[in-house]
Amino acid sequence: MIEQFLMVAGAHFLALLSPGPDFFLIVRTALLHGWRRASGICVGVALGNGLFIGLAWAGLSAIQPGSPAFTILQWAGSLYLAWLGWQLLRSPGTSITVDGSTHGAPRPGWGQGLRMGLASALLNPKNALFYASLFSLLAGTPRSLQALYGVWMVSVVLGWDLLVAAAAGHRAVVERFARHLRSIERVTGATLLLIAVGVATQALANR
């Protein structure tokens, strides 16, 4: 049980460390308008992730362990995690450059920020694939435990994004993170590849 939690929670958090559209939207808004304005985006992103998590949980609970659909889900999750891990390993590194200029930049309200964050999360298909892959690791566990994992993931997304928004007000923090980003992406990629191998092994064992 502890091993499963560390594997799922670790993969989820490491994936958060690799910047995507949500990250840059939060950082730019925090730099231009402060972390309070950016917090609306953080809540919207968490809600969007929560929707994908709920769909992944509902889909998993509808599939019986050992069925052909269950095996297909495991293999699809394994292949996607392996692809994502390989992309991170071979990536030359994501460049973090945020323009701090405020000339002509509209000042979004908190509600507008929430809608922006929600749209950013929902329009990123990688979120749906990633959570479907993660929940394939939870196959066979009680539904109540799967739901707790979902609550945990939403909480971590919100907490991490709020931390990013608060830290983005300090350019030195952003620059320090950027210097270590390549190493973070490599560790994340290697971890996702190992998890993909584990999922594939489970799929073979269930044949």
Task: Label each residue range with its predicted role.
Residues 169-174:
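Short, flexible, glycine-rich and Lys/Arg-enriched loop motifs at helix boundaries
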Residues 66-96, 153, 160-161, 175-207:
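Selective transmembrane alpha-helices of multi-pass membrane proteins
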